[in-house]
Curated annotation (Swiss-Prot):
Keywords: Cell cycle, Cell division, Coiled coil, Cytoplasm, Cytoskeleton, Microtubule, Mitosis, Repeat, Transport, WD repeat. GO terms for cellular component: cytoplasm; microtubule; microtubule associated complex; spindle pole. Self-associates. Interacts with NDL1 and dynein. The keyword Coiled coil applies. GO terms for biological process: cell division; establishment of mitotic spindle orientation; microtubule sliding. It holds the Pfam family LisH_PAC1. Positively regulates the activity of the minus-end directed microtubule motor protein dynein. May enhance dynein-mediated microtubule sliding by targeting dynein to the microtubule plus end. Required for nuclear migration during vegetative growth as well as development. Required for retrograde early endosome (EE) transport from the hyphal tip. Required for localization of dynein to the mitotic spindle poles. Recruits additional proteins to the dynein complex at SPBs. It comes from the Eukaryota. CDD domains: WD40. Residues 71-93 are annotated as: Disordered. The lineage of its organism: Eukaryota, Fungi, Dikarya, Ascomycota, Pezizomycotina. This is Nuclear distribution protein PAC1-1. WD repeats lie at residues 104-145, 147-187, 191-236, 239-278, 283-342, 344-383, 388-450. Belongs to the WD repeat LIS1/nudF family.
Length: 454
């Protein structure tokens, strides 16, 4: 054991063992261990031992959870094409009841995000905490404290092979947490002058990228791009006239879509030194709360809606979706033309996500529902989950697809080779390389996180 652990780690293990034995009334065994290692009552008294109670059990259950996650990832990696086809992931849609209802937050849930590899889900809340769940088991793993006001958004991503969790808050800060080190807060990024409403890791590929870049949106009317390895703000994007609500990077990391209280959405080319809006989307009649960039799998269906005979094949951003307080969803092309208005929600549209298979767009709303819009039927609403939550549905995320190439799976986009829940494919890569996971998470003012899964 001494060869595997440092002297400090061995000492901590011995203390945890003594605390465990003492708390389970195995006093003679605890005394024998004390004598064997020379740890007397004068050095490690009962009061100090109390601090170590439960530590051994916690470490043990963490190892068990990790083993389950490794097995789960291995099973996904080894799944055959036939088994995937039988589950028909391209056509899968969530249905009620949810597989799990996750309860622990004491205030409304504002955001959720999936780990790109493991079955971990992060949720943020007005209770100022982030909670990490095992979405497969439906269990709470830990509670992260650090923000002093509402946690407004969370996202997984970061440098290759080193997944981080980013969070942002009404306390004006962005925080970076290390999942591999018990979610230790490794950096705090100050700089915004008002609440930071959204945060996303930018996929590697953009100049100076390599997965180190993060974009944030704020009530101070700006977007900022950060280098997470240094903590420095490398670019500030100005153009919106009001609060910037949401942000979505393109799969190649070159473009960023933002939404605002100024009733507009803007598409930015962040690969240039001084980014300016490439396209401004004008049409909503109220605050634009959410956005999503369509995956290439959606291009044929959206091109048909737009009246284009041949779907585009080159650009990373050809079609987009935005949701608003005007209760509508708008579909746009890259030129800023609204190609379709989706009407059906009875209240604010809070969240959007494209189905990784490309056929559907899913939305979450303050009308307590989730809606599924079929892009092969010109955006017709083909499914409504009317009992999704008992209050406003504030966020929605799709689990990232499993990418066979681990170097891509741990890429800098924060979603296992995805952006906004849609599969990221390298040039020349086929759809088979990204295995769709039929898992969806939502969060609500009813204090619940819900997991919808196949």
């Amino acid at each position: 054991m001494a060869q595997l652990l440092t002297s400090r780690q061995a000492e901590e293990l011995h203390r945890a063992l003594i605390a465990y034995l003492s708390s389970n009334n195995l006093t003679s065994t605890a005394a024998a261990l004390r004598a064997e290692i020379g740890l007397g009552e004068d050095v490690f008294d009962a009061t100090t031992a109390k601090k170590y109670e439960g530590l051994l059990e916690k470490k043990w259950t963490s190892v068990v959870r990790l083993q389950k996650k490794v097995r789960h990832t291995s099973q996904l990696s080894n799944a055959t094409p036939t088994s995937r086809q039988n589950k028909d992931p391209v056509n899968w849609l969530p249905k009620s009841p949810a597989r799990h209802t996750l309860q622990s937050h004491r205030q409304p849930i504002t955001c959720v995000a999936f780990h790109p590899v493991f079955s971990s889900l992060a949720s943020g809340s007005e209770d100022q905490t982030i909670k990490i769940w095992d979405w497969e088991l439906g269990e709470l793993e830990r509670t992260i404290k650090g923000h002093t006001k509402t946690v407004l958004d969370v996202d997984f991503g970061g440098p290759r092979g080193n997944t981080l969790l980013a969070s942002c808050s009404s306390d004006l800060t962005i925080k970076l947490w290390d999942p591999s080190d018990d979610y230790k807060n490794i950096r705090t990024l100050p700089g915004h002058d008002h609440s930071v409403s959204a945060v996303r890791f930018i996929p590697s590929g953009v100049a100076g990228g390599a997965g180190n870049l993060l974009v944030s949106a704020s009530r101070d009317k700006t977007l900022r791009i950060w280098d997470v390895s240094t903590g420095y703000c490398v670019k500030t994007l100005r153009g919106h006239a009001e609060w910037v609500r949401d942000v979505c990077p393109s799969v190649d990391g070159r473009f960023i879509l933002s939404t605002s209280d100024d009733y507009t959405s803007r598409l930015w080319d962040v690969s240039i030194a001084n980014p300016e809006p490439k396209t401004t989307l004008i049409g909503h009649e109220h605050v634009v709360l959410c956005c999503a960039i369509a995956p290439s799998a959606s291009y044929p269906h959206l091109a048909a809606i737009a009246g284009v005979k041949k779907p585009p094949t080159t650009s990373a951003v050809e079609f987009m979706a935005t949701g608003s307080r005007d209760k509508t969803i708008r579909l746009w092309d890259a030129r800023g033309t609204c190609i379709k208005i989706l009407v059906g929600h009875d209240n604010w549209v809070r969240g959007l996500v494209f189905h990784p298979g490309g056929k559907y767009l899913l939305s979450a709303s303050d009308d307590y529902t989730l809606r599924c819009w079929d892009l092969t039927q010109e955006g017709r609403c083909v499914k409504t989950i009317s009992d999704a939550h008992a209050h406003f549905v504030q966020c929605i995320r799709w689990a990232p697809s499993v990418v066979k190439d681990v170097s891509v799976a741990n890429g800098g986009d924060g979603q296992g080779g995805e952006a906004n829940g849609t599969p990221r494919q390298a040039a020349g890569a086929g759809a088979a390389e990204a295995q769709i996971r039929c898992v969806l998470a939502t969060g609500s003012v009813d204090l619940n996180v819900r997991i919808f899964a196949n």
